[in-house]
């Protein structure tokens, strides 16, 4: 199976639409639509079982969860918005099986394949182009009101059932194997598998994406 690498088109962030008939800028509306389509197209690129935007938009619980999270996260930062944000995230949890705390910071082109059983805590930070499978937990190891959840870099893949716990840092291009338990920092470009997770690096000259696909246990 060929590995797929996503590259962001940052032009949509610079696009500013002309004012509408009342002289109001439509930048926010266009930006939201562009982000919606970006999420949709990146999901299609990662899921060979889906053939169209319509099918993906209607049938992917992972996409539904991240779309609603983008709304609840904005509410979370507004005065008086925290309770509505929590209620919205709990409704999404009931409908999709994906629990993303509205305080979590999620980057662009994030995709949860299959969806069910994913938990992402309040202080988690997730970078761009992250792929996550079902049953993943980005959890805390403290009851204090501090940074207590993981920080995940860009272009990271986290396999089904993996647990990443505490304020650990997961570097860019890391691949975390299915059912692994990560409680320490993982350096960029590494592959982490096992309980507790041990770290290895792809062979010299080997693309880390190809290394991931060499062992199906890393991503199923």
Regions found by a protein language model. Give the residues of each.
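Conserved beta-strand-loop-alpha-helix hinge in the C-terminal portion
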Residues: 190, 194-211
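Conserved phosphate- and dinucleotide-binding cores of soluble alpha/beta proteins
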Residues: 145-149, 206
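Terminal amphipathic alpha-helical/low-complexity segments used for targeting or macromolecular assembly
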Residues: 1-96, 206-220
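Intrinsic-disorder/low-complexity coil detector
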Residues: 17-18, 149, 186, 201, ...
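Left-handed beta-helix
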Residues: 96, 102, 107-108, 113-122, ...
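Solvent-exposed, flexible loop/coil residues
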Residues: 54, 62, 67-70, 104, ...
């Amino acid at each position: 199976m060929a590995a797929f690498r996503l590259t962001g088109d940052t032009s949509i962030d610079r696009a500013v639409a002309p004012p509408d008939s009342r002289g109001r800028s439509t930048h926010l509306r266009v930006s939201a639509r562009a982000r919606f389509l970006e999420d949709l197209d990146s999901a299609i690129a990662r899921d060979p079982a889906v053939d169209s935007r319509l099918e993906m938009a209607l049938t992917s619980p992972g996409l539904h969860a991240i779309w609603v999270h983008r709304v609840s996260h904005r509410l979370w930062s507004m005065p008086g918005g925290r309770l509505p944000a929590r209620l919205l995230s709990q409704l999404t949890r009931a409908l999709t099986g994906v629990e993303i705390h509205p305080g979590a910071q999620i980057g662009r082109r994030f995709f949860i394949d299959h969806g069910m059983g994913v938990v992402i805590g309040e202080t988690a930070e997730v970078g761009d182009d992250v792929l996550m499978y079902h049953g993943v937990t980005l959890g805390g190891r403290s009851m204090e009101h501090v940074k207590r959840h993981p920080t995940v870099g860009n272009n990271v893949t986290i396999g089904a059932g993996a647990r990443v716990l505490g304020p650990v840092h997961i570097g860019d291009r890391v691949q975390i194997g299915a059912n692994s338990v990560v409680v320490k920092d993982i350096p960029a470009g590494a592959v982490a598998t096992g309980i507790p997770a041990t770290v290895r690096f792809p062979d010299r000259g080997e693309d880390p994406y190809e290394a991931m696909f060499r062992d199906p246990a890393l991503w199923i």
